[in-house]
Amino acid sequence: MASYSTNDFKPGLKFIQDGEPCVIVENEFVKPGKGQAFTRTKIRKLISGKVLEINFKSGTSVEAADVVDYNYTYSYKDEDFWYFMHPETFEQISVDEKALGDNDKWLVDQAECIITLWNGSAISVTPPNFVELEVVETDPGLKGDTAGTGGKPATLSTGAVVRVPLFVQIGEVIRVDTRSGEYVSRVK
């Protein structure tokens, strides 16, 4: 198996720490006035999502993680699993709720998602950055009612709830940023 030295560390590098795949979020080389140089890293564990700060002595090596990202198209959901299809090979993969997390509220038919695989099993699903969803429930926007925040909650066709401007009505299709869960615009 391949390994990385602390000299190879950079944000986005994936390696094994305590038997779990991790990705480097930040790293900094530190050379104190006295003592051995070290690399201060902030890592995120890909399965549990925990963020840790770990110091590695200069020259230490870590085992590379066999983690691969693939583009898949969302197909359908049954009781326990969500199914995705590879757009070129038409191979299907099933993903459980643990790997999907709370991203199920952004899945629409034929959405292009990035699935992260480790040892052949899915560990995370990243939905597209922007999705277009229909507003199925929201309060009517009253004219001149801008004393508050200027927004109102709206329930979308997938069950997600986002804050929208007062002019958005039931039945309209809106664009939502899935990374922040915020309203972007109406779709014409």
From Swiss-Prot:
The modification N6-(3,6-diaminohexanoyl)-5-hydroxylysine is found at residue 34. Keywords: Cytoplasm, Elongation factor, Hydroxylation, Protein biosynthesis. The keyword Disulfide bond does not apply. It is found in: Cytoplasm. It comes from the Bacteria. Belongs to the elongation factor P family. GO terms for biological process: peptide biosynthetic process. This is Elongation factor P. Involved in peptide bond synthesis. Alleviates ribosome stalling that occurs when 3 or more consecutive Pro residues or the sequence PPG is present in a protein, possibly by augmenting the peptidyl transferase activity of the ribosome. Modification of Lys-34 is required for alleviation. One of its GO terms (molecular function) is translation elongation factor activity. The gene is efp.
